[in-house]
Amino acid sequence: MLTLENLSFGVQDEKSQKEIIRNLNLTIESNKFVVVTGPNGGGKSTLAKLIAGIEKPTGGRIQLDGVDITEKNITERAQSGISYAFQQPVRFKGIEVFDLLRLASGKQLTITDACQYLSEVGLCAKDYIKREVNDSLSGGELKRIEIATVLARGTKLSI
């Protein structure tokens, strides 16, 4: 379960402090799929970065399964079971989709397991498993492959 208590984040510009997120309270139960929507510049990406540990809140607390992770860095949060998929998927020249999934899983991964992850994100595994992760893939294909790597990690919380 993820709990945000009075979470705030602000940035200093040349004149004043600008609050991006102010006193947000939110609880997300385990094994739930939640979508955060809002206008451009509304703080959605900032919220994701705060949870992942890429940004530090200016106030409030973040708890994962009852453990306060507010002061943990991005590596410690990843070790706690939080994974983060970037808005723009990373391209890896010279690495095939299967190898990327194997690296993401952190364990020996069979072709069958890798194909299952690709199928779960709507890709025909036989068409992608041996493809190189490069500019030949569309943005949508790359995003699906990135989500498959998040699934392969088997984390508690995927952002």
Residue ranges with predicted function:
Residues L2, E19-N23:
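Conserved structural motif at the start of ABC-family nucleotide-binding domains
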Residues T37-P39:
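The feature captures the beta-strand-to-loop junction immediately N-terminal to the Walker
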Residues A52:
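Helix-to-loop junction immediately C-terminal to a conserved catalytic motif
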Residues G60-V67, S80, D113:
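Conserved ABC transporter NBD signature motif
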Residues D68-S83:
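ABC ATPase NBD coupling module
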Residues Q88, G94-D113:
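Q-loop/switch helix immediately C-terminal to the Walker
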Residues I147:
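Hydrophobic anchor residue at the start of the ABC signature
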